[in-house]
Amino acid sequence: MARLPKLAVFDLDYTLWPFWVDTHVDPPFHKSSDGTVRDRRGQDVRLYPEVPEVLKRLQSLGVPGAAASRTSEIEGANQLLELFDLFRYFVHREIYPGSKITHFERLQQKTGIPFSQMIFFDDERRNIVDVSKLGVTCIHIQNGMNLQTLSQGLETFAKAQTGPLRSSLEESPFEA
């Protein structure tokens, strides 16, 4: 079996869900009687469709997850993770404004996992560029996290273990 990362890190906005939690929706959030997560105005708030399956797959492979987000809406982001029942998939959460470098340095300190044993999924190129400099295998997300992106990301990670590390911006199987 191919080598697996020791930690899979996910951005939140436009990676797990299709919005910016600090501008496009209106916290606080709640779960309605039909199980739908809604914001203060009653607007439905959803994950990208395959996100729960992606996280279950990683869990079944024994790969722990973490969240790393630069949002200023810290409480709202954590509330959504709880309402979507995603806390169980994330052993650590680094959710606060600032550089993703700081998020990863703290994740490395908390877990003891080397950067080279981490994989990171994010929709913003600047984060991919910054974090890849640490030696993390970085995967650029274009239309939300899905199973195909996970499989391609794990393949990229496995290849990086046998050669020089690179981000998916250089040779991306996700871009047309």
UniProtKB/Swiss-Prot annotation:
Residues that bind substrate: 20, 70
Keywords, ordered alphabetically: Hydrolase, Magnesium, Metal-binding, Protein phosphatase
Residues binding Mg(2+), per UniProt: 11, 13, 123
Entry cofactors: Mg(2+)
Reactions it catalyzes: O-phospho-L-tyrosyl-[protein] + H2O = L-tyrosyl-[protein] + phosphate
Homology family: Belongs to the HAD-like hydrolase superfamily.
Protein name: Magnesium-dependent phosphatase 1
Species this protein is from: Homo sapiens
The organism's taxonomic lineage, starting at the top: Eukaryota, Metazoa, Chordata, Craniata, Vertebrata
